Amino acid sequence: QHWSHGWYPG
């Protein structure tokens, strides 16, 4: 899974 929250590479 990949998220785009800023702390995770997404």
Curated annotation (Swiss-Prot):
Pfam family, one: GnRH
Transmembrane segments: none
Modified residues (Glycine amide): G10
The keyword Secreted is assigned to this record: yes
Compartments, as annotated in UniProt: Secreted
GO CC aspect terms: extracellular region
Family, similarity comment: Belongs to the GnRH family.
UniProt-recorded name of the protein: Gonadoliberin-2
